[in-house]
Amino acid sequence: MNFNEILYGVAYYDEYMPYDRIETDFKMIRDAGMNVIRIAESTWSTWEPKEGVFDFTHLHRMLDCATKYELKVIVGTPTYAIPSWLAKKYPDILAVTHNGKELYGHRQNMDITNPDYLHHAQIIIEKLMEQVKDYDCVIGFQLDNETKPYDTCSKYAQAKFVEYLKNEFPDIDEFNREFGLDYWSNRVDDWDAFPDIRGTINMSLDAEYKKFQRKLVTDFFAWQADIVKKYKRDDPVSYTHLRAHETSQDLV
């Protein structure tokens, strides 16, 4: 999609508002010289209040009003703040970190390698895309929000790390030499006996795990992009990520 103007706008959440002023707000946004809003990325629990029950009332209010006031819209996938029902049904979705297991409440508390999380995230992304794909005001999509690896050290992440190491070091003896694991009897001679990474005293191995965690973010973005691309036209796909230089790749 080609733009003949600089995009300048705000994030807007009709679903947060305690009173109805969407018409007033959108007119003020337009009168202030803005031309775009970002929506939808923060309220999975609004779009899916119960498992399999979807309510996109606020979404369509924003899209219809944006059309009326000639505002462009960037739609965000709502995967960085999980609903309470999801955490209750699948407690393993809450990330395990070096500091222990996350509790539900704040955002960005989930394990992006957990298969139950990925399954339900795909469902809400696809449902959201089905709702917005035919609106002319939609000009692009944001994947997740401020994405990080969240220091995930779950059994899923650690299993992926071992597979990553196997691929990087087909010879396990080379792996031990490369990381100096004879020190303090840290040597690993069987991949199936690879210890919990949270206990490592080897800073090189710890750094390799952090590098791997950044790869998890890249893979997560690519996975979401593949879902969104099934629904988008020639709309761009973007993301908000303060460490983008560490994980960026061509997602579009």
Model-derived features: positions:
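Aromatic-lined substrate-binding rim segments of carbohydrate-active enzymes
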Residues: F26, I39-V96, A225, K229-Y231
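Short, well-ordered coil/turn segments that N-cap beta-strands
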Residues: N4-I6, G33-N35, T67-V73, D134-I139, ...
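N-terminal carbohydrate-binding accessory modules
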Residues: M1-V36
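Conserved small/polar residues in nucleotide/adenosyl-binding loops
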Residues: T240-T247
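A cross-family glycoside hydrolase active-site/sugar-binding cleft signature
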Residues: G9-Y13, R38-A40, I74-P78, Q142-D144, ...
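Active-site-adjacent "subsite" loops/lids of carbohydrate-active enzymes
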Residues: A81-K133, D151-K210
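The substrate-binding groove and active-site-proximal loops of carbohydrate-active enzymes
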Residues: Y8-M17, T43-T57, L103-H120, T147-P149, ...
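Conserved, mostly hydrophobic/aromatic
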Residues: V10, I29, A66, F141, ...
